[in-house]
Amino acid sequence: MSHGGGGHAAELFPEDQVLAIGAVLSIIGMYVAQFVPSLAMLIGGLLAAGACVAGANTTRRVAAYGLGTGVPSIGMVSLGMGTISALAGVLIPSAFGLPVLATPILAAVIAVVVGFIVGKLTQNPVGMKVPIIVSSMTKLSLMGALAILGFCTAFAGGFSADLIINGAINNGVIALAFIAAGMSILHPFNACIGPDESHKRTITLAVACGLMAWLIFSIAKLDIVSIVVAAIFWLYTYGSFVKMSLGDACEVKYVPELPKKE
């Protein structure tokens, strides 16, 4: 059932479980990239997609209440909070002499705090009446931060300040992370929303979007092995989504080729 005017089906996968799995996978991927740079994109990039899937799942739940601003807006808010938190997590250890290995955990903690504050602000003074807005903003901030930092770490080959600044910020890769991760978080439910929405189909598209983000980063990095593996995974997952969509559709109409002249 849908809440308000949103429209999502029954929940097949508990949100907190999806969130925990996405968070753990993305953090593991960052540490793999830090300790084994040669596998940064192959493993780190793949596992960073987990944060995108978890973020998309939370977007599905909160957006079903009817945000009034459209589903994409909350995806952009997620990545806005996430970018601030990820950068703080990277820069604070070098500024205060903390261990570099604390970076992913520190970024996650900051993201939770930022998300909670933003969630409270959406209640008062903004006045949104969505009952789960505070918890959802907190979760989206966390997933946004882990997705941003995960893909940037995979590209840069580590999460120390010098690696991230030179390998992801100065070259603009963090902007790519913002857009790729943002689309992966906001698009799945935005594409599947409606009276016939199913959790399985939306999550399948979320996985496909996360894998596409990984593929984009693999291409940008020119990592041939990661490109091939990501492309195979994405084609299989997106193909599964298309089959589900055709199977769930009431009717499928194939548009013929447009006439070349009147």
UniProtKB/Swiss-Prot annotation:
Its main location: membrane. InterPro entries: THM_MeTrfase_su_C (IPR005865). It holds the Pfam family MtrC. It is found in: Cell membrane. It comes from the Archaea. GO terms for molecular function: tetrahydromethanopterin S-methyltransferase activity. Pathway: One-carbon metabolism; methanogenesis from CO(2); methyl-coenzyme M from 5,10-methylene-5,6,7,8-tetrahydromethanopterin: step 2/2. One of its GO terms (cellular component) is plasma membrane. It catalyses: 5-methyl-5,6,7,8-tetrahydromethanopterin + coenzyme M + 2 Na(+)(in) = 5,6,7,8-tetrahydromethanopterin + methyl-coenzyme M + 2 Na(+)(out). Its EC number is 7.2.1.4. GO terms for biological process: methanogenesis, from carbon dioxide; methylation; one-carbon metabolic process. The keyword GTP-binding does not apply. It is a multi-pass membrane protein. Keywords: Cell membrane, Membrane, Methanogenesis, Methyltransferase, One-carbon metabolism, Transferase, Translocase, Transmembrane, Transmembrane helix. The chain crosses the membrane at residues 35-57, 70-92, 97-119, 140-162, 172-194, 214-236. Belongs to the MtrC family. The complex is composed of 8 subunits; MtrA, MtrB, MtrC, MtrD, MtrE, MtrF, MtrG and MtrH. Part of a complex that catalyzes the formation of methyl-coenzyme M and tetrahydromethanopterin from coenzyme M and methyl-tetrahydromethanopterin. This is an energy-conserving, sodium-ion translocating step. This is Tetrahydromethanopterin S-methyltransferase subunit C.
